[in-house]
């Protein structure tokens, strides 16, 4: 039976339609909602010429009939208010007075808007909107469902009661039971003698019990009084008052505490407090107690906006009981758009701040909770701005910055050299494709970008060395302050096709200095003007590799890519040119195909070098994924490089070491990487790196690594008065992995060993215990640093849907175990998951 009625109780009519075993009722709330067809809205005007607005979608004219428009996805419309929503009733049978008292019997339901009421039988009074539910009562409202033996409530859920309810909250996957439920408003539900958990009834590992729990859907939070936390049915904590979010939205309040043990600080406990200032701003206050040092206060402030974003962090320990002094740290990172588009572009001006500093040399070692943080010895304080010029000057980018350093000396008398401060640096860069690539109407390239490319850059820097606050108390050069101007220019003409490429290039660099030595008797700083010419070229050959299809299980392609790179730079004596920001570039596959063996602006290597290389690739024919890559390269120097970092090279060599690198991805997710550097004059490898990993499925990984470095003999010189014999300086092994021991327990570990010192470098042993609503992690870690061993014991209990308690071993596991994957969190519920 379908029942149409007006909420006011007049002008009602009844339309009977026989339906087997069920009667369906529909209650109209306003006379205007009775089936009155409305003509479609007028079509928008057509686009004017030159307009960028999208063309309208034309809907065929069907006269006075509303036409449904096809759509490619289900859309959630604007919700209808309760006073305008229709009321539906469904049951096996219905009797009573239509406008006064209705009795729905057998699988009864009442639906209105986002409210669904179900029971075996429902007595419903439309005038008062009150329903009495008898047998298997159920109320679904928004993201919550309540079930009990019987209930009395208003259908709009503004008031009512339910006995012995069981409830579920979809967004947080929470559930619980209570002695009684009282519905105070449409959004506030109060439970007496209630429980709360995110566990399933089959695995009730933890739950909260409370005298009273109040769920507020408007504020999207749950509040409770006299709460007791139960773990494996054992009370572990009493909470007089607690508040938890019922959605993913942020909320101010106490976060779970962080606890652990460290051999330097003793027992370490932090109680975070989160402040949700605004949707784009928040603050976390971090009071921290260390049994061997005292109480530290820390904090983190975050902000984000279309034109700016920033993070400010800091810690302050008023009196370190172990060190006998105040300790502090700050870290400020800021991005700011002053003008134009925040993403950059012509006319945009963007600024930034990266500033960090600590109170003393040992602060990172004493207080950092990560390996990377504990070995940090240098902090930057950098402020700058960059802008792309507008209009016809848009090929130019200008910038300015100041940069100072705090260099720590944690291992005195061994010292760390401090770099020069830059106060300030002003740069201007120009780059233009004189003949840009052409493209079709679809935006795809018709011709590759093969036109000439020109570039020009200028750099003015003022270097300063703060001798008074640095150890050692002499500058790394003979100058304590200097001005340097660098001008670079280049013109290149790349030609590229699918089978080959040629890239000729000419460039120059000019350096000029205005510097005074801090001691008399030294020659003034020497500048230079040095040109360079280079030619980079390569070929590409490819064929089907049917013979490898059986090994890899699919069609494969084999390619060979020979490459030749020649560079010529005349020799210019730079023995009297100072060093401010320059060092050796190192030696690897990327460095061997480069113009300069130095990084920075104070040295230009003399070149008459030809580098030859060959790369072979095995790729999947269907996807292009690389399964194996092998590279061989060697450089020949026809005259021998004479320019060195700290002076001229006395006996330059004509041939470089031979480089070999290979990377293989076998079936079964086994990967192997090998790198070797072979010295042809000494007939031995001077550097070897081998790594391998097996990751058959997520959460399973085994890793192996080996590294060996051998240094050839170094003769004494004016810049190195001691010299050194040939020796192996590195010979290290490491093993790591993650593997499940059972369905619920996984083991994580790492072992690093140095065969030269016969010492264990680092050890990690960790266990993860995972259930549907509970994750427990524990880790034991030892790290050998500067002949001192630091021991950590970390533990963490993650109550899913509630929070995390304990120190965070996940970061430690990610850092030590390549491929480590923490236990995945449950998927966020879909808006249709509990669709009624």
Q: Where do the protein language model's features map onto the residues?
A:
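Short, linear, compositionally biased motifs with a strong N-terminal bias
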Residues: 15, 29-30
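N-terminal signal peptide c-region/cleavage motif recognized by signal peptidases
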Residues: 32-34
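N-terminal amphipathic/hydrophobic interface segments
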Residues: 38-192, 207-226, 260, 285, ...
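Outer-membrane beta-barrel proteins and related beta-barrel translocases across Gram-negative bacteria
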Residues: 138, 144-160, 168-196, 201-209, ...
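Intrinsically disordered, low-complexity segments enriched in proline/serine/threonine
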Residues: 8, 20-22, 42-47, 58, ...
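Bacterial N-terminal signal peptides that target proteins for export
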Residues: 3-24
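Initiator methionine at the very start of the polypeptide chain
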Residues: 1, 37-38
